[in-house]
Amino acid sequence: MSIKSDKWIRRMAEQNGMIEPFEPGQVREAAGHKIISYGTSSYGYDIRCAPEFKVFTNIHSTVVDPKNFDEKSFVDMHGDYCIIPPNSFALARTVEYFRIPRNVLTICLGKSTYARCGIIVNVTPFEPEWEGYVTLEFSNTTPLPAKIYAGEGCAQVLFFESDEVCETSYKDRGGKYQGQRGVTLPKT
């Protein structure tokens, strides 16, 4: 299993629709202002956060249960940025839609710009033949409100190609998050 380069990522995105929309270079500026970078890097792809958020709240004092998740635990927000309360978290989704090849697994790591501010971005691996918009989890580990930005980079996806094709892919087993479109809450 080897990590894939910018050339491979570009080819797979442009010829096979692996990432849509796709940015072949690194974008570091928009409308004359510096932004948190996104697009193709040497050995990965920096994904962007879309302008739809679900911010965790304790207004209804429900129990957090991944097997029986109460949607009232979140407040929906839309905009160019989102403020996460202290010691809380928000869910978002990527701007990009992914189609992962059968012989590829990805690992996604939060960008250091956010990590250095106490904002942790968590994403599980994208499994072989998974496709959809990626649900992102932003944890504010600080005692202060934290700001995250839509349309800017938030995490980097690393692509690993196996030397053999898997026997059973995510699509084959009917994965519960296959084809997800918006910010997707826990499912069992």
Curated annotation (Swiss-Prot):
Active site per the UniProt annotation: 137 (proton donor/acceptor)
Gene (name only): dcd
Protein origin, superkingdom: Bacteria
Subunit-structure text: Homotrimer.
GO biological process: dUMP biosynthetic process; dUTP biosynthetic process; nucleobase-containing small molecule interconversion
Stated role: Catalyzes the deamination of dCTP to dUTP.
NCBIfam families (UniProt xref): dCTP_deam
Hydrolase listed as a keyword: yes
SUPFAM superfamilies referenced in this protein's UniProt entry, alphabetically: dUTPase-like (SSF51283)
UniProt keyword list: Hydrolase, Nucleotide metabolism, Nucleotide-binding
This protein's name: dCTP deaminase
GO MF: dCTP deaminase activity; nucleotide binding
Class of the enzyme per the UniProt entry, highest EC level: hydrolase
Family, as annotated: Belongs to the dCTP deaminase family.
Pathway of action: Pyrimidine metabolism; dUMP biosynthesis; dUMP from dCTP (dUTP route): step 1/2
Residues the entry annotates as binding dCTP: 111-116, 135-137, 156, 170, 180
Record's catalysed reaction(s): dCTP + H2O + H(+) = dUTP + NH4(+)
InterPro entries on file: dCTP_deaminase, dUTPase-like_sf, dUTPase_trimeric
PANTHER family, A to Z: DCTP DEAMINASE
EC number: 3.5.4.13
Stretches that traverse the bilayer: none
